[in-house]
Amino acid sequence: MAGPQRRGSGAGGGERRDRKGRDGGAAAAEKTAYVERVVAINRVAKVVKGGRRFSFTALVVVGDGDGTVGVGYGKAKEVPAAIAKGVEEAKKHFFKVPRIQGTIPHPITGEKAAGVVLLKPASPGTGVIAGGPVRAVLECAGVHDILSKSLGSSNAINIVHATVAALKGLQRPEEIAARRGLPLEDVAPAALLRARAGAGA
């Protein structure tokens, strides 16, 4: 007389395990597809009837390193949970950053509260010349050559949001040419024209 079959054994159990492994692998691949930078972690206190209740806030920048970036702010009782919330919030606010040959199309200034950030295009090989908060946003966005300067507040939150405001204000040369009614050659950077000429050769 055959004994009772164990739950999960046999072909059905193996199929479930394989499916779980495939799903777990897909989730891990999606998680590692993004570049994450924790810009600031602060401990905050809320005064309640029984005393003070502490929690943590995390400012996180997430991007794919290829022109997409977002910023999120998370709050929780533990640091890892605050970071996780910040990552999810950042993914909800993804936006595209116009780039040309690893840099930005034109100089621009971004402002947020007392934070003011100036961004300028740079030639290949320059690298990211920027402070910590600005660098985090630019690296996650996939900008490899750029000059920047913070002209206002030193508050990391203001600096990050000022950088985001600057990147959101960037326009592609095609958009500028169409708005001004000019040919692309009159407004496009030389690097873009050389790249297009090389691609067409």
Swiss-Prot record:
Q: Any transmembrane segments, and where?
A: none
Keywords from the UniProt entry: Ribonucleoprotein, Ribosomal protein, RNA-binding, rRNA-binding
List, in alphabetical order, the GO biological process terms annotated in this UniProt record: translation
Domain (S5 DRBM): residue spans on this chain = 34-97
At the top level of its lineage, which domain of life is listed? Bacteria
Molecular function GO terms recorded:
rRNA binding; structural constituent of ribosome
Region of interest called Disordered, as start-end residue ranges on this chain? 1-27
Give the signal peptide as a residue range, or say none if absent. none
One GO cellular component this record assigns the protein to is: small ribosomal subunit
Record field: compositional bias (Basic and acidic residues): 14-23
Q: How does it assemble?
A: Part of the 30S ribosomal subunit. Contacts proteins S4 and S8.
- Purpose of the protein: With S4 and S12 plays an important role in translational accuracy. Located at the back of the 30S subunit body where it stabilizes the conformation of the head with respect to the body.
Per the record, what about its domains? Answer: The N-terminal domain interacts with the head of the 30S subunit; the C-terminal domain interacts with the body and contacts protein S4. The interaction surface between S4 and S5 is involved in control of translational fidelity.
Family of this protein: Belongs to the universal ribosomal protein uS5 family.
Protein name stated in the entry: Small ribosomal subunit protein uS5
Could you tell me which species this protein originates from?
Answer: Streptomyces avermitilis (strain ATCC 31267 / DSM 46492 / JCM 5070 / NBRC 14893 / NCIMB 12804 / NRRL 8165 / MA-4680)
